[in-house]
Amino acid sequence: MGYQHNRSFNKATGAGFIIAMGIVYGDIGTSPLYTMESIVQGQGGLERISETSIIGALSLIIWTLTLITTVKYVWIALKADNNHEGGIFSLFTLVRKYAKWLIIPAMIGGAALLSDGALTPAVTVTSAIEGLRSIPAFHEAFGQQQLPIVIITLAILAILFLIQRFGTSIVGKVFGPVMFIWFSFFGITGLINLFGDFSVLQAINPYWAIHLLLSPENKAGIFVLGSVFLATTGAEALYSDLGHVGRGNIHVSWPFVKVCIILSYCGQAAWLLQNRGKSLGDINPFFAVLPQSLIIFSVILATLAAIIASQALISGSFTLVSEAIRLKLLPRLRINYPGESFGQLYIPAVNLGLWLAASFIVVYFQSSAHMEAAYGLAITVTMLMTTILLTVYLAQHQKVKKVFVVLFFGAFIFIEGLFFAASAVKFLHGGYVVVILAALILFVMAIWHKSDQLFYKYLKSSNLNDYKEQMNKLRKDESYDLYHTNVVYLTAKMDKEWIDRSILYSILDKRPKKAEVYWFVKVNVTDEPYTSEYEVDMLGTDFIVCVNLYLGFHMRQEIPRYLRTIVTNLMESGRLPQQHQPYSIIPGRKVGDFRFILLEEKLINARQMPAFERFVLQTKEQIKKITASPARWFGLHFSEVTVETVPLVLSDVRNLEIHERISKENEVENLSK
């Protein structure tokens, strides 16, 4: 069911250390492939970059990794876990009780993080494949042509997204060891190149970071931060993957990962100092520091690391969407569980969307340099939203002093605000693609959240106690044939004995549904990820059963599985009579047949509704046409199901005036009378 159930959540193990390599650090671990390259290009290339720019950029990278990744996420954010689960939606569930407006940063951050999921696989795989240009044979055959790079990248992405439906448990077992080799490889090569110029170590002094931002030698100005930020884009994913590996394993493994990453950047900086001023064309410092004998190996290893980073992000996107669905921030989508572990999700619609978006980005931008110009903008938004939610969490924590909360908020809003401002220019250089995608996701979230509020506003309720006698007479009325032994209604609104009025209309008015037992089931999603509990109220009868299911936001909402257990428990306790079942392949079966009734609300005659509310509900109806059916979502595809359409809003017809048209013949006849 997931590593989060391990009792050693706060402890570190050797296996957990390796697992963390493959799951948590894929994104941040591939940043050395393109971060320094982006900085060099922003400074005018190898020919024009200055020593101050190299040392200053390295200092900015070191302190960005320290302040944002280490301090904010590893030291602080990892403590804000929701029953061992991390990420922006888990953080939201911890603080949403304090203020309704917190839904806004949660939706904005979630939408931005999902949109980034399309760009990350494209930029990481492209950056790795571009390393082929460092191989003489490849360079002689294709030169600086980008088409072969694009074709290879598209092929790798196609394979990556196509295998998702089969699960990744087998290949996932090698992710950790491969990433451990990857980190060790570029850490060691960085250390070797560091011996070429130890002067880069002065970058540890934050003076050089500040000096670069103010220096006239900095040709990119404040916008250099847009490239520097690429070094820490994986920090948000680190927090999101908390539930997969545990806090202890992240705390122990991060120092190793950070040292390797910084050594890689130091090695690249040392090489740049030795070769600045030379005309070497478009070079990637990551591959340039390597001897020719290691180029092929490094490209293969970098490609594997890029695939692993992309896989981790794709899996993270599946988890993020499933959480948003259960928090009623996104429509229901079909979710499959292809692996042996419950935590392995596969959402076909999300997989297809990410694949198409990533492929479009590769074709549209062509090179990793162009992608890097658009990369990072969405993550700065997510980090700002996380800072807001995390501040509220810390403010409500009794052990945290208020002065620390103020300092935390002020410091990280300022730092991340600078990164956002520096990255905003990326909007004009392709960032608009990610912004448009994030805006579309946010639009759907806003519509879904608001429509849910309107649904409860217009839904009418009735008291079941007022209709118990009628329902009892109906179940005993011999003039009606038995509809089904058990009739089950799934309802979104049930407060004790008060239920959706449309359900009673379906039972008594449409076509009286005679049954031995009437079930009313409501699913309540809890803030805990793996809750599975229920409450039963039979209203003093043995034929009405009101069931409140309490399921964690990571649990499958498969109603028949839970209902079988509840029926058995009620019969064993004597609260529910045994049901005679003469024909069955199960000897001695004492539970009758079930019919599930799903009521589908349609917006009808909503002219009296405000225009905005009408737009929201009509938009939701259009979105629902391409989402998973309630029957599939609730695991009813192998059960007997009836779907009935009922009006959500119906104007009072008694206020409508209509007059009978009388013909001349009838008028004469009426006068004669």
UniProtKB/Swiss-Prot annotation:
Q: How does it sit in the membrane?
A: Multi-pass membrane protein
Residue stretches in coiled coil: none
Main subcellular location of this protein, as a coarse class = membrane
Query: Is Transmembrane one of the keywords UniProt gives this record?
Result: yes
Is Transferase a UniProt keyword of this protein?
A: no
A Pfam cross-reference name: K_trans_C
One Gene Ontology molecular-function label: potassium ion transmembrane transporter activity
Q: Which InterPro entries would you find in this protein's record?
A: K+_transporter, K_trans_C, K_trans_N, Kup
- GO CC terms of this entry: plasma membrane
- Alphabetized UniProt keyword annotations: Cell membrane, Ion transport, Membrane, Potassium, Potassium transport, Symport, Transmembrane, Transmembrane helix, Transport
Q: Where in the cell is it found?
A: Cell membrane
Reaction it catalyzes: K(+)(in) + H(+)(in) = K(+)(out) + H(+)(out)
Q: Which residues cross the membrane?
A: 14-34, 58-78, 101-121, 147-167, 175-195, 196-216, 220-240, 252-272, 294-314, 345-365, 374-394, 403-423, 427-447
Q: Its function?
A: Transport of potassium into the cell. Likely operates as a K(+):H(+) symporter.
Spell out the family assignment given in the record's similarity comment. Answer: Belongs to the HAK/KUP transporter (TC 2.A.72) family.
Q: What is this protein called?
A: Probable potassium transport system protein Kup 1
Q: Which organism is it from?
A: Lactococcus lactis subsp. cremoris (strain SK11)
Print the organism lineage: Bacteria, Bacillati, Bacillota, Bacilli, Lactobacillales
